[in-house]
Amino acid sequence: MDTVPKVTVLIPTKNGGAIFAKVLEHVVAQHTPWPFEVLVIDSGSSDNTIDICRRYPEVRLHTIPSNEFGHGRTRNLGVSMARSEFVALITQDALPLNEHWLAAMVAAIEPDPAIAGVFGRHIAYPDANPFTTHELELHFAGFDAWQVVQMDDPERYTRDQGYRQVLHFFSDNNAVIRRSVWEKLPYPDVDFAEDQIWAQKIIEAGYKKAYARDAVVVHSHNYELFERLQRSFDEAYAFRRLFGYVLCPSPWALVSSWAALTRRDLAYARRSRLLGTQTKAVLMAPFDNFMRLAGHYLGARGDRLPGRLRQRLSRDKRLMLGLGAAGGKAEK
């Protein structure tokens, strides 16, 4: 009789390539005091992703047609197939930093049945832009003061957008959810931000959310300028439609935010003496910041744009339609 696992590690894939091979190697090598299983759901890989999975007899592989993939839908399928109390969610390019990643994540959620989900820290790949590395450090350091949260002030939750954002931030690039809660509150079937919508649902239902600083994955992207605009467009368009947030409310906000971000980056470059070692990154930082904010400005007004232009500006939509990189799989 098979041993029932405590955790299922769920990895959606499409054309994961060499980095996925390394991710899977690190996942199956996790050291835990309890059994776990690995479930890969592939949506039409044309590279060697399937062969990589078959190197590991213990890995469960399930395939679906590419047109059936959806960020929320595919994760719901995987969780429904899990045999475990907890489901760990990572992506094909999120590399566990060490062999204690999974145990650290579960240790943060298991003791309190009111905790519905926990997310872990991201750090950048060694080849990442230094400003990406710094921004990830700042972003996740902000959660050190919010290790376990729940909605303890409904009035503040209603009026304070920043408080709401802290409570519903979640990243299923690196997370564990409690399956019994998912059975009541599954993922939404959406193209973007399915993890944050789910976190909003569990917070509003009275559950807690946790942050596991020691459960670390290496995960970052090196975007070209237009890719940065597209990614930011997707973020702002989704946040306007799903949460009502306007990430860049006016041209003046664009200019003032650009100036603030650029001053921050140049100050960091001076402190870290990057001009001599990362000259291109330093020179490109103001342009990258502008494209990010331009994407936020356009995305917040996405419903006013013609459909063809909206599709052109959406990186996620083009990847899902097979018009961009990453083998047509929408990235996270």
Language-model features: locations:
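A conserved acidic beta->alpha catalytic loop
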Residues: 42-50, 94-95
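Glycine-rich, basic loop-to-helix element that forms the pyrophosphate-binding segment
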Residues: 65-82, 92, 104
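Non-catalytic, C-terminal membrane-associated alpha-helical segments of glycosyltransferases
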Residues: 234, 248-332
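A recurrent flexible, glycine/aromatic-enriched loop bordering the glycosyltransferase active site
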Residues: 154-177, 239, 243
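Short, acidic, metal-binding catalytic loop of nucleotide-sugar glycosyltransferases
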Residues: 25-35
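N-proximal low-complexity "stem/linker" segments adjacent to membrane-targeting elements
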Residues: 1-26
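Short aromatic/hydrophobic "clamp" motif used to bind/position activated sugar donors
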Residues: 87
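Conserved donor NDP-sugar-binding/catalytic core segment of glycosyltransferases
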Residues: 95, 99-139
